[in-house]
C-alpha cells in the first residue's frame, strides 16, 4: 500500500514523475542496492561491476568501505570490521559468546552495548553499518541522478526487536528514510513475481553469510501470507569457511591459538576454496610449507552437520505451518551459500523437487526490496498493490500470578497485529500492577525471555477481582512491540515500547523453540500445578478474611475448628508436586465452608434491606 502523499492546495503530483526509492540487502558478507529503471529491477553495481563487501576499515586519516577494506582484513584485523550484522542489537555478553570468531577488541558502552576499539576510537555496530549504508545511498543517488525518498531494507526473519531497531538507527545515521524493514524471505518471494497472481505454498530457503531463514509462504492473488518461519541466527556461509579453516589448521599441524592476522588469512583461503568447489571436484590449498588437496566430497562431509541444522529448521517450519513437504509447489533458493551443490541437493531431497535458482541468489533479496520500495514510494506497479503479511517469530505475553506466562500474541501471528486481554487485581485494595512483558514458548516465566517491565498506578482500591485492566499488545510491520495497560474504571494508562538493550544470543531462538517441543509435557503439568496453587492460595486468603470479619458471629466453635483444620491441611500440601492432591483439598475446604458462605450472603442481604419499604425495593 502506497504511503500517503500530501501536497499544497492547488498542486497535484506529476503523474509521470517517479519518486526515487531503492531496496537494500544489508548482508553479512556483501550488501546490495537495487532499484527499478524502465520497469525492470536491477542491482546497482560499483564502478568495477561488483557488489561491495560488508566491510569497513578504519584508518588514522579516514576509512575504507567495501572490497578494499575486506582485502586488508588479514594485515589489519583489529581495525577492519567484517560481518557486523552479527553484532547488531546485541550486548557485550552476547559478543563474548562468539569468542574467536570475532578478532576485535571490545569495550562496553551504555546499556551493555559493545563498541569496537579502532584507531579512530570506539565504534558501535550501528555506526559501522551506517558507513556501509551511506556508501549504498551515495551510489544509488549518483546512478539515479537525484535524491532518494527512502529505502526498504531487508533483515533476517528472525531478527528481534533490538536488532531491527539497530538497523533503523544505522539507516538514520546514513541519511536514509526507512520506508519499511522487510524480511529477507519475503523480499525473495516478491522478486519471483508474487504480484503476477502466483498461487500455492512456497518454501524460501535462505542461507546467507551469517544467518539461515526458512519461510513457508502462501501465495494468492494480491495477498502474501507467511504461514511459518524458522531458522538459525548463527548459521551461514561464514560457518562453512570456519569448517574449512579448522580443517587446514588440523592438516597443517598449526596451533589452535592463532593471532588475528593468521585467522583472517586462513578464512580467506577457506572462502576461496568453498567457491571453487561449487564448480570443481577438488582444490589445492597451501599455507606456509603445507600444501594439501580438499575434495568436494571431503568438503561436503565437513559441512554436513551444518546442512543438517538447516534441514531440521525446515522440518520444524513445515510442522508449524501444518504443511507436508509434498504440498510445497516451489522452493526458492536465496543467498550466496545456496550455490554450494550439497545445499541444493539437500533442499531437493527434503522437498522432493528441484529448487528455483532462476534469479541470482545473491541479488534476489535486493530486487524484491526494490520492487516493494517502488510501491511504497507511490509509483505503483501496473496499477496493482501488494499486501505483505509477515509474522512474529516468537510468542509475546506477560507474567500472571504463579509466575506463569500468559501468551497474548502467539508465534507465527500475521503482522501488523494488535491483541488485547483483560486482567484483574489479586489482592483487596490493590492500587498498582506490575506488567512484565515476556517472549517465548514455555509455560513458566523462568523459561521465557524478559523484554520489559512497567507499572500501572492509580487503580481504584476495591476488592480483589473487581478492577478491570486491559493490556494491549501492538506489533507493527517492522516487528517492533508496544504494550499498554489501561484501568477501565479510572482511565489511568501506562505503556512501554520494547527496545531491548541487546538482542537474543546466537542460537537462542532455535533453542527456545526446541525446548518448547521437548518439554511440552512437563511444562503443561507444571502450569497445571501452578494454576492449582494460585487458586488454592486465593481461596485460603478469602476464607481467612471471612473468618476475621464474620467468623465469631456466624460460626460455632466446632464449625470454625473444622474450617481451620481443613485450611491447615490445604497449606500442608500447597507446595507439593501433585496438582490433583491440592485440587482435592481445595474441594474439601470449599465444601466445609459452603454453609458459612451462605450465612454471610444472607447477612449481607438482610443488611442491605434493613430499614427499607417494599415499594422502595420494587422501584
UniProtKB/Swiss-Prot annotation:
An example Gene Ontology biological process: iron-sulfur cluster assembly
GO molecular function: ATP binding; ATP hydrolysis activity; ATP-dependent protein folding chaperone; unfolded protein binding
Deleted gene: phenotype: Essential, it cannot be deleted.
Signal peptide boundaries: none
Domain of life per record: Bacteria
Pfam families, alphabetized: HSP70 (PF00012)
Entries under InterPro entries matching the protein: ATPase_NBD, Heat_shock_70_CS, HscA_NBD, HSP70_C_sf, HSP70_peptide-bd_sf, Hsp_70_fam, ISC_FeS_clus_asmbl_HscA
Family matches, as Gene3D superfamilies: 1.20.1270.10, 3.30.420.40, Actin, Chain A, domain 4 (3.90.640.10), Substrate Binding Domain Of DNAk, Chain A, domain 1 (2.60.34.10)
UniProtKB keywords: ATP-binding, Chaperone, Nucleotide-binding
UniProt family annotation: Belongs to the heat shock protein 70 family.
Function: Chaperone involved in the maturation of iron-sulfur cluster-containing proteins. Has a low intrinsic ATPase activity which is markedly stimulated by HscB.
Protein name (record): Chaperone protein HscA homolog
